[in-house]
Amino acid sequence: MSGSRATAATTTPRSAEPPRGLAVAYSGGRDSTALLHATLIAARDSGLTVHALHVHHGLSARADAWLAHCESQCRRWARRGLPVCFRAMRVQLACRSGDSLEAVARAARYAALRTLAVEQGVALVLLAHHQRDQAETLLLQALRGAGVAGLAGMPRSIERDGITWARPWLARPREAIEAYVRRYRLSYIDDDSNDDPRFARNRLRLQVWPALQAAFPQAEGTLADAARWAQQAAACVADLAALDLAACAATNDVLPLTAWRQLAPHRAVHALRRWLQQAGVTAPTAADLERLMAELPAGAPARWPLKGGELRRYRGELRFVPTPDATREPPAVRETTLALRRGGRYRLPGWGGVLVAERVRAGGVPAAQLAVLSLQPRRGGEQFQGEAGRPARSLKKQYQAAAVPAWARGGPLLYGGDGRLLFVPGLGVDARAMAAPGEPQLALRWEPLPTG
């Protein structure tokens, strides 16, 4: 696994409480420059502030100059009355043997963009990907042997980690963006890494694409159309897998194997893939899935190593157990309070995991009770009610009754401001704390932090 570390942040002068608005991922290249400029023009009379977010990877010797260019450009636009606020973050990439530099840099970039967006109080980040990017993505995924989900390419909009990532120009040809840049005489930088043949996308763009477009002039549009069809097909597969998992009474932590084995093979494999993703397995490979499909019905072995952890069968149930990260030093102090104001993923490194909150119509905790939460360890004597009308019992007995193994009982107990127990990792929401039907509410679940 790999990671990155934010080392510094640079910003133009701003008030202590910056106005809320939206953000644009701004590298300084042609596409993001055009998108930022167009967004500023559209926002000028709306009262919105547009936050230009720049990530300094340090991969190029010119990275400092690019940051300076982006900040200077935003200052010029601000002097012309455009509602821009520039923010930048430096990250240090940490690649390990076998890691893809492209993948590591991309993950670090999105993590930094999310951090910057949260700091500015915005929940919408615009990305400048266009139709050519989508066509290239489909080709790359096909060459990697991807399934329908990979062939779907990049979504036009997706919500992840409490942020909506949108690509408003995904159906726009590259030529239209080039024309926009010429029309407004926009200044942008040329990233020399785009000519580096070590990267697969660059080889495709520089060596394959010219020949492909010469032979098939409509390739960009038709490949993007194919990606849209694949997105619809992938959505159907995902919906069916979700229905199958619900029929199996699966949760994000547990897959009941007896019910799963009743599925037809072509449905079982997609249900298994979806469950693995929900359980926190990082991109299960085709070989992983083939092995599991062959060995799970046979009943042996009891453990399967996967990237980032291992699968374990326990009392007819399948669980994923992340591998402890020996390189991570646990914080000296655990988080003791938390405010959940909306759905999202809340990292709690002191407890070694992530609390996931999702808006639901039933089975959740009243949103009003989540404004002030107390996080506490097990001390003994806690009582948990699993179902309405059933007696509350000790956590030990509830864990045993639910067949939750010891290694799946980590994480904090969540108490409301009135001192009532609301949520227990591995067991869920206490029945006494559940919201009434129709009341705004959030479902909670606990996920161990990924390794690396």
Swiss-Prot record:
One Pfam family from the record: ATP_bind_3
Residues that hold ATP according to the record: 27-32
Gene3D superfamilies the UniProt entry points to: 1.20.59.20, HUPs
Superkingdom classification of source: Bacteria
GO CC entries: cytoplasm
Family indicated by similarity: Belongs to the tRNA(Ile)-lysidine synthase family.
Protein name: tRNA(Ile)-lysidine synthase
Gene: tilS
